[in-house]
């Protein structure tokens, strides 16, 4: 199967993922191969809310948020395969082998490369890598589970 190139901007991403500011961590999808692979971009700026406290005078993107960005990229890939995606959420079921190799700082552009290891209708295991330029910043294996999305309260 030929690799599908597909660019999605943040507006397109918001049609797939339920995340919003300040926790939407994807700015663009630059590669998308159904049920196999996704490559997404996160542009990191000093305006990120987490830099206020992590760490004053030495801003570093929290590693857990890099892993979250990997999971969001995987979610963007896999939720498109769910027929009733507006009624489902993809949530963490596990994080394995997370390694942080290089700090991510304001001004960096993080390239998230996520490959499907196992895909089932209700769960997936993904291998993700986050790069800044050609340097590996983070890698992790994440497991996700698809669950029903709670109904919105009528007054929201």
Curated annotation (Swiss-Prot):
Subcellular location: Cytoplasm
Segments crossing the lipid bilayer: none
SS bonds (residue pairs): none
Gene3D superfamilies for this protein: Hotdog Thioesterase
Keyword Cell division among record annotations: no
Signal peptide (from-to): none
One Pfam family matching this protein: FabA
Domain of life: Bacteria
InterPro entries hit by this protein: FabA_FabZ, FabZ, HotDog_dom_sf
Reaction catalysis annotation: a (3R)-hydroxyacyl-[ACP] = a (2E)-enoyl-[ACP] + H2O
GO MF assignments: (3R)-hydroxyacyl-[acyl-carrier-protein] dehydratase activity
Assigned keywords, A-Z: Cytoplasm, Lipid A biosynthesis, Lipid biosynthesis, Lipid metabolism, Lyase
Single Gene Ontology BP annotation: lipid A biosynthetic process
GO cellular component terms attached to this protein's record: cytoplasm; membrane
Biological role stated in the UniProt entry: Involved in unsaturated fatty acids biosynthesis. Catalyzes the dehydration of short chain beta-hydroxyacyl-ACPs and long chain saturated and unsaturated beta-hydroxyacyl-ACPs.
Family recorded in the similarity comment: Belongs to the thioester dehydratase family. FabZ subfamily.
Name the record gives this protein: 3-hydroxyacyl-[acyl-carrier-protein] dehydratase FabZ
Originating organism: Koribacter versatilis (strain Ellin345)
């Amino acid at each position: 199967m030929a690799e599908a190139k597909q660019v999605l901007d943040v507006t397109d991403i918001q049609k797939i993922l339920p995340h919003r500011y300040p926790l939407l961590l994807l700015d663009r999808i630059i590669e998308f191969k159904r049920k196999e692979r996704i490559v997404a971009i996160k542009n990191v700026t000093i305006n990120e809310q987490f830099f206020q406290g992590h760490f004053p005078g030495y801003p570093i993107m929290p590693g857990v948020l890099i892993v979250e960005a990997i999971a969001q990229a995987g979610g963007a890939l896999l939720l498109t395969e769910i027929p009733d995606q507006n009624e489902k959420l993809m949530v963490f079921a596990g994080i394995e082998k997370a390694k942080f190799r290089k700090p991510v700082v304001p001004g960096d552009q993080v390239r998230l490369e996520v490959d499907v290891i196992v895909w089932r209708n209700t769960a997936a295991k993904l291998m993700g890598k986050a790069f800044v330029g050609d340097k590996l910043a983070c890698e992790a294996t994440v497991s996700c589970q698809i669950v029903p999305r709670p109904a919105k309260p009528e007054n929201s």
